[in-house]
Protein backbone atom coordinates (compact mmCIF):
# COMPACT_ATOMS: atom_id res chain seq x y z
CA UNK A 1 0.00 0.00 0.00
CA UNK A 2 1.07 3.55 -0.68
CA UNK A 3 -0.19 6.99 0.31
CA UNK A 4 -0.11 10.00 -2.00
CA UNK A 5 -0.68 13.70 -1.36
CA UNK A 6 -1.71 16.35 -3.87
CA UNK A 7 -2.26 20.10 -3.75
CA UNK A 8 -3.41 22.62 -6.32
CA UNK A 9 -4.39 26.27 -6.39
CA UNK A 10 -5.79 28.54 -9.10
CA UNK A 11 -6.61 32.22 -9.24
CA UNK A 12 -10.25 33.36 -9.43
CA UNK A 13 -11.17 35.51 -12.42
CA UNK A 14 -14.37 36.98 -13.82
CA UNK A 15 -15.55 35.49 -17.10
CA UNK A 16 -14.46 31.94 -16.26
CA UNK A 17 -16.58 28.94 -15.26
CA UNK A 18 -16.12 27.55 -11.75
CA UNK A 19 -15.69 23.78 -12.00
CA UNK A 20 -14.88 21.69 -8.92
CA UNK A 21 -14.98 17.91 -8.86
CA UNK A 22 -16.40 17.96 -12.37
CA UNK A 23 -19.40 20.04 -11.25
CA UNK A 24 -20.05 23.48 -12.72
CA UNK A 25 -20.95 25.72 -9.79
CA UNK A 26 -22.79 29.01 -10.30
CA UNK A 27 -20.51 31.85 -9.19
CA UNK A 28 -19.51 35.29 -10.43
CA UNK A 29 -15.91 34.14 -10.90
CA UNK A 30 -14.23 30.99 -12.13
CA UNK A 31 -10.75 29.54 -11.89
CA UNK A 32 -8.04 30.61 -14.31
CA UNK A 33 -5.94 27.89 -15.86
CA UNK A 34 -4.90 26.14 -19.06
CA UNK A 35 -7.51 23.40 -18.58
CA UNK A 36 -10.87 23.92 -16.84
CA UNK A 37 -8.72 24.64 -13.72
CA UNK A 38 -10.56 22.14 -11.52
CA UNK A 39 -8.28 22.36 -8.47
CA UNK A 40 -9.98 19.43 -6.74
CA UNK A 41 -9.43 16.98 -9.59
CA UNK A 42 -5.90 18.29 -10.16
CA UNK A 43 -5.00 17.68 -6.50
CA UNK A 44 -6.44 14.15 -6.73
CA UNK A 45 -4.50 13.46 -9.96
CA UNK A 46 -1.26 14.58 -8.32
CA UNK A 47 -1.96 12.49 -5.21
CA UNK A 48 -2.59 9.37 -7.31
CA UNK A 49 0.47 9.88 -9.49
CA UNK A 50 2.61 10.63 -6.45
CA UNK A 51 1.45 7.54 -4.57
CA UNK A 52 2.51 5.36 -7.50
CA UNK A 53 5.74 7.37 -8.04
CA UNK A 54 4.63 8.09 -11.60
CA UNK A 55 5.38 11.80 -11.80
CA UNK A 56 2.90 14.63 -11.53
CA UNK A 57 0.07 16.23 -13.46
CA UNK A 58 2.40 18.76 -15.11
CA UNK A 59 4.57 16.00 -16.57
CA UNK A 60 1.63 14.07 -18.00
CA UNK A 61 -0.51 17.04 -19.12
CA UNK A 62 1.79 20.05 -19.67
CA UNK A 63 0.16 23.46 -20.00
CA UNK A 64 2.37 24.03 -23.04
CA UNK A 65 0.38 21.36 -24.94
CA UNK A 66 -2.62 22.83 -26.77
CA UNK A 67 -4.56 19.55 -26.62
CA UNK A 68 -5.18 20.23 -22.92
CA UNK A 69 -6.49 23.79 -23.43
CA UNK A 70 -9.84 24.07 -21.58
CA UNK A 71 -10.01 20.26 -21.22
CA UNK A 72 -12.50 18.77 -18.79
CA UNK A 73 -10.39 17.60 -15.85
CA UNK A 74 -12.56 14.50 -15.46
CA UNK A 75 -10.81 13.35 -18.66
CA UNK A 76 -7.43 14.00 -17.04
CA UNK A 77 -8.49 11.99 -13.97
CA UNK A 78 -9.66 9.17 -16.24
CA UNK A 79 -6.26 9.13 -17.95
CA UNK A 80 -4.49 9.10 -14.57
CA UNK A 81 -6.69 6.18 -13.48
CA UNK A 82 -5.60 4.33 -16.63
CA UNK A 83 -1.93 5.10 -15.96
CA UNK A 84 -2.25 3.64 -12.46
CA UNK A 85 -4.17 0.60 -13.68
CA UNK A 86 -1.55 -0.16 -16.35
CA UNK A 87 1.15 0.13 -13.67
CA UNK A 88 -0.69 -2.43 -11.52
CA UNK A 89 -2.29 -0.15 -8.91
CA UNK A 90 -5.86 0.25 -7.69
CA UNK A 91 -7.40 3.02 -5.62
CA UNK A 92 -8.59 2.22 -2.10
CA UNK A 93 -9.81 5.68 -1.11
CA UNK A 94 -9.60 9.42 -1.73
CA UNK A 95 -9.85 12.09 0.98
CA UNK A 96 -9.91 15.70 -0.18
CA UNK A 97 -10.57 19.25 1.00
CA UNK A 98 -11.45 22.33 -1.05
CA UNK A 99 -10.48 25.67 0.52
CA UNK A 100 -12.76 28.49 -0.67
CA UNK A 101 -14.36 31.47 1.03
CA UNK A 102 -17.22 31.43 -1.49
CA UNK A 103 -19.36 29.96 -2.95
CA UNK A 104 -20.96 27.50 -0.56
CA UNK A 105 -19.98 24.04 -1.80
CA UNK A 106 -22.08 21.75 0.43
CA UNK A 107 -24.96 21.44 -2.09
CA UNK A 108 -22.52 20.13 -4.74
CA UNK A 109 -20.38 17.70 -2.75
CA UNK A 110 -22.50 14.60 -3.37
CA UNK A 111 -22.22 15.07 -7.15
CA UNK A 112 -18.47 15.71 -6.88
CA UNK A 113 -18.04 12.45 -4.95
CA UNK A 114 -20.10 10.55 -7.51
CA UNK A 115 -18.11 12.01 -10.43
CA UNK A 116 -14.77 11.12 -8.86
CA UNK A 117 -15.91 7.62 -7.87
CA UNK A 118 -17.33 6.92 -11.35
CA UNK A 119 -14.10 7.90 -13.11
CA UNK A 120 -11.91 5.95 -10.65
CA UNK A 121 -14.24 2.90 -10.81
CA UNK A 122 -14.75 2.87 -7.03
CA UNK A 123 -17.76 3.43 -4.79
CA UNK A 124 -18.70 6.96 -3.74
CA UNK A 125 -18.25 5.77 -0.12
CA UNK A 126 -14.53 5.51 -0.93
CA UNK A 127 -14.39 9.22 -1.83
CA UNK A 128 -14.50 12.05 0.69
CA UNK A 129 -14.83 15.67 -0.41
CA UNK A 130 -14.87 18.33 2.28
CA UNK A 131 -15.05 22.11 2.02
CA UNK A 132 -13.72 24.75 4.35
CA UNK A 133 -13.00 28.47 4.43
CA UNK A 134 -10.01 30.34 5.79
CA UNK A 135 -12.19 32.61 7.94
CA UNK A 136 -11.38 35.51 5.64
CA UNK A 137 -7.60 35.04 5.87
CA UNK A 138 -5.11 34.77 3.00
CA UNK A 139 -5.73 34.61 -0.74
CA UNK A 140 -8.72 32.27 -0.32
CA UNK A 141 -10.24 34.52 2.31
CA UNK A 142 -9.81 37.54 0.04
CA UNK A 143 -11.48 35.50 -2.73
CA UNK A 144 -8.44 35.70 -4.97
CA UNK A 145 -8.21 31.94 -5.46
CA UNK A 146 -9.31 28.46 -4.45
CA UNK A 147 -7.09 25.58 -3.39
CA UNK A 148 -7.54 21.86 -2.82
CA UNK A 149 -5.69 19.15 -0.91
CA UNK A 150 -6.02 15.41 -1.52
CA UNK A 151 -4.72 12.26 0.12
CA UNK A 152 -5.12 8.85 -1.52
CA UNK A 153 -4.42 5.27 -0.60
CA UNK A 154 -3.56 2.80 -3.36
CA UNK A 155 -2.52 -0.85 -3.41
CA UNK A 156 -1.13 -3.34 -5.89
CA UNK A 157 -3.99 -4.78 -7.94
From Swiss-Prot:
The record marks 34, 133 as: Transition state stabilizer. It catalyses: 4-CDP-2-C-methyl-D-erythritol 2-phosphate = 2-C-methyl-D-erythritol 2,4-cyclic diphosphate + CMP. Keywords: Isoprene biosynthesis, Lyase, Metal-binding. 4-CDP-2-C-methyl-D-erythritol 2-phosphate binds at residues 8-10, 34-35, 56-58, 61-65, 132-135, 139, 142. Involved in the biosynthesis of isopentenyl diphosphate (IPP) and dimethylallyl diphosphate (DMAPP), two major building blocks of isoprenoid compounds. Catalyzes the conversion of 4-diphosphocytidyl-2-C-methyl-D-erythritol 2-phosphate (CDP-ME2P) to 2-C-methyl-D-erythritol 2,4-cyclodiphosphate (ME-CPP) with a corresponding release of cytidine 5-monophosphate (CMP). Binds 1 divalent metal cation per subunit. Belongs to the IspF family. CDD domains: MECDP_synthase. Homotrimer. A divalent metal cation binds at residues 8, 10, 42. Its EC number is 4.6.1.12. InterPro entries: MECDP_synthase, MECDP_synthase_CS, MECDP_synthase_sf. Pathway: Isoprenoid biosynthesis; isopentenyl diphosphate biosynthesis via DXP pathway; isopentenyl diphosphate from 1-deoxy-D-xylulose 5-phosphate: step 4/6. This is 2-C-methyl-D-erythritol 2,4-cyclodiphosphate synthase. It is an enzyme of class 4 (lyase). Its cofactor is a divalent metal cation. GO terms for biological process: isopentenyl diphosphate biosynthetic process, methylerythritol 4-phosphate pathway; terpenoid biosynthetic process. GO terms for molecular function: 2-C-methyl-D-erythritol 2,4-cyclodiphosphate synthase activity; metal ion binding. The keyword Metal-binding applies.
Amino acid sequence: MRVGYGYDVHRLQEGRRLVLGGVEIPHMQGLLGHSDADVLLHAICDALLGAAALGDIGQHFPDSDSQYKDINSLLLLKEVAGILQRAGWRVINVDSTVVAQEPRLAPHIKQMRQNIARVLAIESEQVSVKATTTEGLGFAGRQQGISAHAVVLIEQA
